[in-house]
């Protein structure tokens, strides 16, 4: 019988095994690194977002904020509080009211942290003097620390005071900004504007300043377009469910009295003006957006205006996101 002398082949076997294990490890490392860099690249592609909101006015702001929370395509840098001094319910400091609401609302979401910053309680006095606040400084700071090729998306759900003030304080940040504003009425066929609208009236000087800012990337979700996004109360309350976040939104719907209209006294329906701009940024395929000339009383330049939204799909998208969100929120046992 012939025997194989393994002592002769053993070194070669070790070399082969070593090469095999090295190759295997290299492949494993490659997979790990590929997944890491893919995740990092995906994370880097998120939009850097600040929401500027008059959340103590109305209820639609809170639905808009809800849609933005933990949105995978957003890097939510902060929520700044805006003033709404023209409301008949206005206190001496409506920005502070909004700030307190923001703290209450975000506090309902366990393990979720986002900077909450107080903005100016007053509108601009003129188009040259900013209303310096923590919010305007926060906007400036966030714009400055972003890499040159990255944009800061400022979503204005109320008055334009904080954003306009930031630009007045630091005009060099203009090229870093994409400003999305919910405001004024717009006739898309005639390209005529009606600035007699709540958000616009709360700081008409600031609104005009943004319209007059040459080179500023300004995108408008007009009241004309956003009014198409309407939620039904019974459907909304059923979908909100019994949880801290849903109960807060239901209470807000029930208790807030709409001073601007005598229609639908029972509040069976609510226009989600502000949710429309969040939905549009997340799902641009659900919108039409076109380029228009600014109003005749403003600097002659081009801005972008949303002319239509798919309100049904936008609402469906909200509820899909909401259900995912509340799955991470413990139900109130009481």
Predicted segments with their positions:
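Short linear sequence motifs
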Residues: 2-3, 13, 23, 27-30, ...
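N-terminal acidic, glycine/proline-rich low-complexity segments
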Residues: 41-334
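Bacterial Sec-dependent N-terminal signal peptides
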Residues: 3-43
């Amino acid at each position: 019988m012939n025997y194989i002398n393994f002592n002769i082949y053993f070194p070669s076997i070790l070399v082969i095994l070593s090469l095999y294990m090295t190759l295997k490890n290299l492949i494993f490392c490659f997979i790990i690194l590929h997944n890491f860099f893919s995740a990092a690249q995906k994370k880097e592609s998120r939009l850097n977002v600040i929401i500027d909101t008059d959340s103590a006015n109305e209820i639609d702001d809170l639905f808009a904020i809800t849609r933005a929370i933990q949105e995978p395509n957003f890097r939510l840098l902060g929520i700044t509080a805006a003033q709404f001094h023209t409301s008949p319910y206005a206190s001496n400091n409506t920005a502070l009211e909004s700030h307190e609401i923001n703290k209450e609302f975000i506090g309902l979401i366990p393990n979720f942290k986002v900077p909450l910053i107080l903005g100016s309680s007053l509108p601009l006095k003129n188009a040259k003097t900013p209303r310096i606040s923590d919010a305007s400084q926060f906007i400036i700071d966030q714009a400055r620390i972003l890499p040159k090729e990255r944009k800061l998306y400022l979503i204005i759900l109320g008055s334009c005071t904080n954003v306009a003030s930031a630009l007045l304080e630091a005009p060099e940040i203009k090229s870093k900004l994409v400003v999305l504003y919910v405001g004024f009425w717009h006739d898309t066929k005639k390209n005529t504007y009606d600035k007699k609208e709540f958000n616009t009236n709360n700081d008409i000087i600031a609104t005009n300043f943004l319209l007059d800012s040459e080179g500023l990337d300004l995108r408008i979700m007009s009241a004309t377009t956003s009014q198409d996004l309407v939620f039904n109360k019974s459907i909304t309350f059923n979908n909100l469910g019994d949880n801290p976040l849903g109960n807060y939104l239901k209470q807000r719907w029930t208790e807030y009295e709409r001073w601007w209209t005598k229609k639908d006294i029972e509040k069976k329906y609510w226009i989600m003006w502000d949710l429309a701009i969040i939905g549009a940024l997340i799902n641009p395929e659900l919108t039409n957006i076109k380029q228009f000339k600014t109003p005749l009383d403003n600097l002659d330049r081009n801005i972008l205006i949303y002319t239509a939204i798919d309100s049904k799909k936008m609402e469906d998208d909200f509820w899909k996101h909401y259900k995912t969100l509340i799955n991470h929120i413990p139900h109130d046992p009481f």
